Amino acid sequence: MRSAKLKFEKRRSRIRHKISQTSNRVRLSIFKSCRHIYAQIIDDSKSITIASASTLDAKIKKLKKSHCNIENAIKVGKAIATKADSAGIKEVVFDRGGYKYHGVVKALADAAREKIKF
């Protein structure tokens, strides 16, 4: 029986392989920890980060103990969409990073879809 960590790593590598085949677009990558959620727009051909947003940003950060919830994921999604729009990015590939498309990940993606197409 596979452990949860091994399943996660296998899922992440499978997603990254599929994304690497569509290399003509930049990718919106997310990472979530127990306390925070991070989003980055990365250009893999140049190996640079174009824009980033997280719950550590001053506009999003509050006095709550946990910032990795749906309410803050929506704020991070809107922030990354605004930064991408100002950088002139209209289309991205969504890299959920091995996380299941549910809850916080879905909320961030739906909020980012307001200004970015993926």
UniProtKB/Swiss-Prot annotation:
Keywords: Ribonucleoprotein, Ribosomal protein, RNA-binding, rRNA-binding. One of its GO terms (cellular component) is cytosolic large ribosomal subunit. It comes from the Bacteria. GO terms for molecular function: 5S rRNA binding; structural constituent of ribosome. The keyword rRNA-binding applies. Gene3D superfamilies: 3.30.420.100. Coiled coil: none annotated. GO terms for biological process: translation. This is one of the proteins that bind and probably mediate the attachment of the 5S RNA into the large ribosomal subunit, where it forms part of the central protuberance. Belongs to the universal ribosomal protein uL18 family. Part of the 50S ribosomal subunit; part of the 5S rRNA/L5/L18/L25 subcomplex. Contacts the 5S and 23S rRNAs. This is Large ribosomal subunit protein uL18. It comes from Rickettsia canadensis (strain McKiel).
